[in-house]
């Protein structure tokens, strides 16, 4: 039991630091002036003061503290739900690494460093690698939970 918990913690930390590091490296390149333009996607620098689609931007500086509370609350929840943590350590590592990276941006740059602008056929919100990793992590977690439960139900039947 302890061995699987240690392994899960290592997997979590590996995912956390990988996503955090890659995201911060990309943001560094953007902050140093990297730009790209095409018919579909542009790489531009935007400081997002809100969350997705600039929601909650009216909270200004308080948003980063709200996000810290959310991250800490989720982490405390996971400590108490150790089986959930062990089952989805990589997904939680991705989500936490990306979330902490975005919160760090708020403290260092005054807003999240966003840069991917999709505009082919319609304008989409500008986002970053961390945003994608949060979506992927949550998506994989939900898919695994759904299919795992389906598999468990078939075994019981």
Swiss-Prot record:
Q: What class of enzyme is it?
A: hydrolase
Q: Which GO terms describe its molecular function?
A: aspartic-type endopeptidase activity
Catalytic activity line of the entry: Release of signal peptides from bacterial membrane prolipoproteins. Hydrolyzes -Xaa-Yaa-Zaa-|-(S,diacylglyceryl)Cys-, in which Xaa is hydrophobic (preferably Leu), and Yaa (Ala or Ser) and Zaa (Gly or Ala) have small, neutral side chains
Per UniProt, which keywords does this protein have? Aspartyl protease, Cell inner membrane, Cell membrane, Hydrolase, Membrane, Protease, Transmembrane, Transmembrane helix
Can the keyword Glycoprotein be found in this entry's annotation? no
Q: Annotated pathway, please?
A: Protein modification; lipoprotein biosynthesis (signal peptide cleavage)
Major location category of this protein:
membrane
Supply the EC number(s): 3.4.23.36
Q: Where are the transmembrane segments?
A: 10-30, 38-58, 59-79, 84-104, 122-142
Which GO cellular component terms are attached? plasma membrane
Keyword Zinc: yes or no?
A: no
Q: Name one GO biological process term.
A: proteolysis
Q: Which InterPro entries match?
A: Peptidase_A8
Q: Which residues form the active site?
A: 114, 131
Q: Which PANTHER family match?
A: LIPOPROTEIN SIGNAL PEPTIDASE (PTHR33695:SF1)
* Function description: This protein specifically catalyzes the removal of signal peptides from prolipoproteins.
- Name the family the entry cites: Belongs to the peptidase A8 family.
Q: What is this protein called?
A: Lipoprotein signal peptidase
Q: Which gene encodes it?
A: lspA
């Amino acid at each position: 039991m302890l061995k699987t918990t240690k392994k899960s913690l290592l997997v979590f930390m590996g995912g956390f630091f990988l996503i955090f590091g890659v995201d911060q490296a990309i943001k560094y390149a953007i902050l140093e002036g990297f730009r790209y333009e095409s018919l579909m996607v542009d790489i531009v620098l935007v400081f997002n003061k809100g969350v997705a689609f600039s929601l909650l931007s009216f909270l200004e500086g308080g948003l980063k503290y709200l996000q810290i509370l959310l991250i800490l609350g989720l982490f405390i929840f996971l400590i108490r739900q150790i089986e959930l943590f062990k089952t989805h350590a990589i997904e939680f590592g991705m989500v936490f690494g990306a979330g902490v990276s975005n919160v760090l941006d708020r403290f260092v740059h005054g807003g999240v460093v966003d840069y991917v602008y999709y505009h082919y056929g319609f304008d989409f919100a500008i986002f970053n690698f961390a945003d994608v990793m949060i979506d992927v992590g949550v998506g994989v977690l939900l898919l695994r939970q759904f299919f795992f439960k389906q598999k468990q139900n078939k075994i019981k039947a």
